């Protein structure tokens, strides 16, 4: 059983080919009297960039829904994925604790806990106790089901699906998810914000870095809400809008 601090690992697995041209084509079609093929021939890289800038300035976001991005994330906690799936216009596939037996589960240690020896010791002890409880419950239930005539493989599966309830939010997990560009921009507004929790903020920043490599003009103004507008946090605002613009723009 090993703990991790801030070891989120994000990879952009797949994305719509030529995402910026696809978005520009969809947007231009709304205003063009010509056919799709003729319109596409006229879309040079320069015109694509110009059209994307115009779209963003107008707030015309529906065309950006035509492109999607698929990510894989590892080294993240269940606490993070509970927050992630609140962004509902997306598709998610997460490692199952019901079907995957965790003989030695890994866990995420929050940095504030990790840098204090006392709280770190308490935290690690709690993680170790969770593993011991899981092992004992799973073993006890498995033997019970076998004694009742159940086959071993089926008994193990049935046992771990209940034993998993003792695992904490810190339990490390892996997830693959797909979002369209409009959902991503909304995600970045909320999760790149300093008021988002540290772990999902780290994830959001890594994701933004990845999509900027393949669609730099599309995500040029992405980041927390204050980067390209007003802060919606009111009295809870961090007051760092100018600093955020320097970081993200």
UniProtKB/Swiss-Prot annotation:
Domain (ThyX) ranges: 8-225
Record protein name field: Flavin-dependent thymidylate synthase
Active site, renumbered: 191 (involved in ionization of n3 of dump, leading to its activation)
CDD domains, sorted: ThyX (cd20175)
Swiss-Prot/TrEMBL catalytic activity: dUMP + (6R)-5,10-methylene-5,6,7,8-tetrahydrofolate + NADPH + H(+) = dTMP + (6S)-5,6,7,8-tetrahydrofolate + NADP(+)
Organism: Clostridium tetani (strain Massachusetts / E88)
Protein family: Belongs to the thymidylate synthase ThyX family.
GO terms of biological process kind: dTMP biosynthetic process; dTTP biosynthetic process; methylation
Positions annotated to bind FAD: 62, 86-88, 94, 180-182, 186
Pathway: Pyrimidine metabolism; dTTP biosynthesis
ThyX motif (motif): residue ranges: 86-96
Gene Ontology molecular functions: flavin adenine dinucleotide binding; NADPH binding; thymidylate synthase (FAD) activity; thymidylate synthase activity
Cofactor: FAD
Documented EC number(s): 2.1.1.148
